[in-house]
Swiss-Prot record:
InterPro entries: aa-tRNA-synt_IIb, aa-tRNA-synth_II, aa-tRNA-synth_II/BPL/LPL, Anticodon-bd, Anticodon-bd_dom_sf, Pro-tRNA-ligase_IIa, Pro-tRNA-synth_IIa_bac-type, Pro-tRNA_synthetase. Pfam families: HGTP_anticodon, tRNA-synt_2b. CDD domains: ProRS_anticodon_short, ProRS_core_prok. Keywords: Aminoacyl-tRNA synthetase, ATP-binding, Cytoplasm, Ligase, Nucleotide-binding, Protein biosynthesis. Its main location: cytoplasm. Belongs to the class-II aminoacyl-tRNA synthetase family. ProS type 2 subfamily. One of its GO terms (molecular function) is proline-tRNA ligase activity. Its EC number is 6.1.1.15. This is Proline--tRNA ligase. Homodimer. The lineage of its organism: Bacteria, Pseudomonadati, Pseudomonadota, Alphaproteobacteria, Rickettsiales. It catalyses: tRNA(Pro) + L-proline + ATP = L-prolyl-tRNA(Pro) + AMP + diphosphate.
Length: 426
């Protein structure tokens, strides 16, 4: 993609009402723009990142046999009244009426809808276990939206729901989703710390939050230092991970902690996912059941959420420097930024154009503008593509291009042929 043809409204200065790094860089790099308090428009560059994260999530879910659906954003209030949760979200849940004066809600979550879906469509216990997921926009009227896309009112979420015939099978589904979450976060370049958590208005008696370590996090985490190695191990052992001590500040007690204080690490964390075993909380109140051996039994359920749009902010929080964002390669909007620092030089221009023509335009952002070298480098550092390909003086004098890694700032000199052979298919 040619920068001259792309729309990236960058900002030179940081807005005065912005505090956290992810909010600063998501505005300055032209990922988003605020439309109202806690509500953002996603611009071309930001939307590419959002879609790349969504694709990673879908790939991991799909290869684990989890089926994608799409449920309605507007839901009948009657389902929430039936489940007993209509008042649980208070003013956070937006309530509306249609032209027939029927009460509807703008869904903050989808437990009621998916339970209703299964109770009306499940025909046999042989369809169990079953896990369904969707990637859907949601709305919660936060009292104090802040930190940009980290805590906003409208957000993109991946939510999944499991249905099983008994407790043991439900825990197997829970553990499967636990493992899938670790795989997703690792592909995104993150090391998730799973901590036992309160279930809140979602319900159930077992839940884990997934956090990443970040100084800007709102939660304080306490964890056995061995958990990092377990999370990063190629062979993910869910039982070992679940049995290794981790706790957020609301559940940690230093006096009753079962491991030595010398083994405990403390850090701030950002929540990026949450999983719940719900039991029969919804199936009982909404009569979602199946029949086996002429006996009617309630479904055992679980639910599992990842804040997709929140992940964009969380990744920036842990992957940046003083110059801008450092995108992990898996989700970067472009893999390469191609920079011609001598745009007035015919030879440099021809080399840049020829190289650009040989690259996939979806993989490269080509700065073909007439801006100064300093502006070009500052802009590319801000935007954070993993690799910067620089055409300049060395190219003219020695026939070599400079390939600079954004994260390490290390550079390699090579011919265009070497670059294409080494990087194009990597």
């Amino acid at each position: 993609m040619r920068l001259s043809k792309y729309y990236i409204p960058t900002l030179k200065e940081t807005p005065t009402d912005v505090s956290v790094t992810s909010h600063v860089y998501s505005l300055r790099s032209g990922l988003i723009r605020q439309v109202a308090s806690g509500i953002y428009a996603w611009l071309p560059l930001g939307l590419k990142v959002l879609k790349n994260i969504e694709n990673v999530i879908k790939e991991e879910m799909n290869k684990s046999g989890i089926l994608e659906v799409l449920m309605p954003l507007i839901q009948p209030a009657s389902l929430w009244q039936e489940s007993g949760r209509y008042n649980d979200y208070g003013s956070e849940m937006l309530r509306i009426k249609d032209r027939n004066n029927r009460e509807m809600v703008f869904g903050p979550t989808h437990e009621e809808v998916v339970t209703d879906l299964l109770r009306t469509t499940l025909t046999s216990y042989k369809n169990l276990p079953l896990i369904l997921y969707q990637v859907q926009w949601k709305f919660r009227d936060e009292l104090r939206p802040r930190y940009g896309i980290m805590r906003c009112r409208e957000f993109l979420m991946k939510d999944a729901y499991s249905f099983d015939k008994d407790f043991n099978s439900a825990i197997e589904s829970y553990n499967l989703m636990f493992k899938v979450y670790i795989q997703i976060f690792r592909r995104l370049g993150l090391t998730p710390i799973a901590v036992k958590a309160d279930s809140g208005p979602i319900g159930g008696n077992l839940s884990h939050e997934f956090h990443i370590l970040a100084n800007s996090g709102e939660s304080t985490l306490y964890y056995d230092q061995d958990i990092i190695n377990l999370i990063n191990n190629d062979n993910i052992d869910i039982e070992k991970i679940k049995n290794t001590y981790t706790a957020a500040d609301d559940l940690h007690n230093s006096e009753t902690c079962p491991i030595p204080a010398s083994n405990i690490k403390t850090s701030k964390g950002i929540e990026i996912g949450h999983i719940f075993y719900l039991g029969d909380k919804y199936s009982k109140t909404m009569n979602a059941a199946f029949s086996q051996n002429n006996e009617t039994q309630l479904l055992h359920m679980g639910c599992y959420g990842i804040g997709v749009s929140r992940l964009v902010g969380a990744i920036i929080e842990v992957s940046h420097d003083n110059n801008g964002i450092i995108w992990p390669e898996e989700i970067a909007p472009f893999k390469f930024s191609l920079v011609n620092v001598f745009s007035a030089n015919k030879e440099c221009r021809n080399i840049s154009e020829n190289l650009y023509a040989k690259l996939d335009s979806n993989d490269v952002l080509y700065d073909d503008t007439e801006d100064s070298t300093g502006i070009k480098f500052s802009r590319m550092d801000l935007l954070g593509m993993p690799w910067q390909v620089i055409i300049g003086k060395t190219t003219i004098e020695h026939g070599l291009i400079e390939v600079r890694q954004r994260s390490s700032k290390k550079s390699l000199l090579m011919s265009t042929e070497q670059f294409l052979n080494n990087f194009k298919k990597s």
